Each structure stands twice: as C-alpha cells, then as structure tokens.
Amino acid sequence: MSATAVEPAAAIETVTARRIIDSRGNPTVEVDVVLEDGSLGRAAVPSGASTGAREAVELRDEDPTRWHGKGVDRAVAHVNGEIAASVRGRDAADQAGLDAALIALDGTAAKSRLGANALLGVSLAAAKAAAAARRQPLYRYLGGADAHLLPLPMMNIVNGGAHADNPLDFQEFMIVPVGADTFAEAVRMGSEVFHTLRRDLLAAGHSTGVGDEGGFAPALRTAEEALDFVVAAIERTGYRAGPDIGLVMDPASSEFFRDGGYDYAGEGVRRSPAEHADHLAGLIDAYPVVSIEDPMAEDDLDGWRELTDRVGDRCQLTGDDVFCTDEALVREGIRTGVGNSVLVKVNQIGTLTEALATVATAHEAGWTVVMSHRSGETEDTTIADLAVATGCGQIKTGSLSRSDRTAKYNRLIRIEEELGASARFAGRSALRRV
C-alpha cells in the first residue's frame, strides 16, 4: 500500500464526530477529519446484527431511555475530546502511525474503552482526508497505480436468520454473476434476476418485503426452498445457474449453534456437527453453490476443519465470525486448516491498518478475501474503494435494493468507468477453486 509515502505531509487540524442514523434507524458515528490545507475526509461507521464473539467492541451508551440503549453519544464524545486532542497535528498520510496511536490511546485488546466505532471513524476519515490532499480517489491513494481490479459482487437476494422476520434458518442466499465481462454487466445481471425473483415470489403467494440487506424475506422454511426459487429465477431470466451465475450461502451458523449442535428452528430439527456438515455438502452437490460463509459455528473448529478437508477443494469457505477480520485469528486458521477465505469487515477490527494487514496475510497464504458491508449500513461507500485498492476481487454489499446497498454498487460502476481501458473485472477467477 502506498498510503504511508504521501508528500508533502498533511497535518490534521480538526476532528469532529457526530451522531447520524444508519439503515436500521439506529444511531451510528460519523467523523470528519480536516487537514491544515483544508482537505476533508468523512467516514460513517457501520454496525452488525449477527456479530462474532471476538469482534472489537462497538461502544453503545446502554441508556434504555434514549435510542433503546443503542445511543453512541459516549463514542462521539471520545472522538471530539480525547481522540481529537491526541491526533491533532499528526500527519494523516502516516496511516500506520495514526492507527497505532489510536490503538495505544484506547489501551485495551478489544478497543472497549474508547470504542472501535470511535477509532474506526477517525482511521477511515483520516485516510480519506489524506487522499483528498493528494487529489486522488481513495482506491488509488491506498492501492497505488496497480489498483484496477473490480470485484465480483455477492448479491443478497433472499434474507433469513437475524436479518429477517421469517422462518429461514440460514441468513443469506446470494448470487454471483461469474459469467459477466464487466462489473456494470454483473450489476445488470443481478438486477434482472432480483426482479424476476420478485415476480416469482408474488406469483407463489409470498411477501416481497425486504430484510436488512435488501433481499426478499419470504416465509420459506428450508435452504432447498430458497435455492429452488433462486435457481428458477436465474433460468427464467435467461441465464444458466452455474456457468453464468453461481450461488452463495451465509448460514451464519454461530447464530443457531447451541450446546454442541445446530438447532434449525425453522425446520424444527436439530443436527449434530457431522449432520450439519453433511447437509451443507449435500447442498453443494445439488446446487451450483460456489461459496459458503460461516458454514460452521465460530466455536466448532473441529467442524470447520472437517468441512474444509471435505469440500474446500471445490467450494470457497469464508470465515466471518471465526476470524472477525483479526490477522492473528486468520494466521491461526491458515495454520490449522480452518476455511480457505476470509471476510473483511473493517468495523470488526477497528482500524484501517489492521484490516489491510488481514487482507495481506490472507493473500500471502493463497486465500481469497471478500470485502464486506454490515447489516446496519449508511450511504458511505468506503468499502467499494477498499475492494479495488486491495485487489481482493470479491465484495459483499447486499441486494439490488435499498440505497445503503446500491450506493456501493454505484460507486464501483463509477470507478470502472473512471479506470477505462485499464479496468479488469475479477469474474469467476476471484473464486479460484470453482
């Protein structure tokens, strides 16, 4: 990354945090960093619903009389007070130094004193201010001259689990337009399937209300039902399930792992880890599933290793809760054979430098990386730039509805246009194993 080599130095003049509203109507932190030359960087911090136990701490006020306990006034105050005083005058171009100072200032392993939501807002806003000072888009500033790869999008079109009020145990069913030639074409293909699926669900008597991430949330009970609807929509749109558009699932298995087993409440069955793995392997065999996120629970490491041995050569197995964007946890996963891919959510770890280190470690091991949103999002499009900057080749940023999701797609469409002839679309090659 080239972010530490910016000249001339651009000193931070002011740091200002405020409370804004996320896509679920909950408060979140937004930070402005202004440099001495007037350059502005602004970043809004996302929030998750299904969170890993090892995530950095999102500081909430926990005052039940305001915002139902979800206020962020303490985090905002930390930014406007202690953090601003600490970073004022620092060189915004020294991202690693700035983030190290933020981590030291907090002084806790999980960033629980000041809050990861406070630290991340400053970290990202400083990077964007430094990019503005250099008159570069963020992807170019962070990624250098070689940043030209547009990511394969994982498009969430059916929601379940913690993201929807329906019986589906699995949290997300996604499509990936592996046969597209450009990012813009991938968006078109995804949008067409999304609207076909809407018509199909209506015709079958299902609701077409959407979940937190913009996918439909019909009252389906099994993964097979959801996958059948998605495959039919792909084919009715005129595409081939598999060669043109692959399938991705996120069971979010930690959410229904209880006392050593997997409780499928929607189906009304309980599966042992071995039975759960058998079920997933059966779905891979029966449908063109190219990737599964969190197939096993974060505390079921034996299950993770066994599933990786069993299907890891033909399916991307992406760790979210099990790694929480933590480089040390990813290194351990690489060493012990837990998965073959990592989901990167910058707010899980709390600084840009740490997130980029996780990406680098995964790439060095030959693992794939998926840049990801959270279920509670804003109009902030930073992750779109990060996907291009890192060349990770995959992005997960929700459905083809809700402007908090489509903002990221639109940003990537603009980046592809800006890159012109140098733009490359990752396509199927991003998955490597499929």
Curated annotation (Swiss-Prot):
Location(s), subcellular: Cytoplasm; Secreted; Cell surface
Needed co-factor(s): Mg(2+)
GO cellular component: cell surface; extracellular region; phosphopyruvate hydratase complex
A GO MF label: magnesium ion binding
One GO biological process term: glycolytic process
Residues reported to bind (2R)-2-phosphoglycerate: Q171, K345, R374, S375, K396
Principal cellular location given in the protein's record: cytoplasm
Annotated catalysed reactions: (2R)-2-phosphoglycerate = phosphoenolpyruvate + H2O
Pathway: Carbohydrate degradation; glycolysis; pyruvate from D-glyceraldehyde 3-phosphate: step 4/5
SMART domains: Enolase_C, Enolase_N
EC number: 4.2.1.11
Coiled coil ranges: none
Lyase recorded as keyword: yes
Enzyme class: lyase
Active site, per annotation: E213, K345
Note describing how the cofactor binds: Binds a second Mg(2+) ion via substrate during catalysis.
Keywords: Cytoplasm, Glycolysis, Lyase, Magnesium, Metal-binding, Secreted
Binding site for Mg(2+): D250, E293, D320
Family matches, as HAMAP family: Enolase
Entry function: Catalyzes the reversible conversion of 2-phosphoglycerate (2-PG) into phosphoenolpyruvate (PEP). It is essential for the degradation of carbohydrates via glycolysis.
Similarity comment text for this entry: Belongs to the enolase family.
Protein name in UniProt: Enolase 2
Species this chain originates from: Streptomyces coelicolor (strain ATCC BAA-471 / A3(2) / M145)
Source organism phylogeny: Bacteria, Bacillati, Actinomycetota, Actinomycetes, Kitasatosporales
Gene that produces this protein: eno2
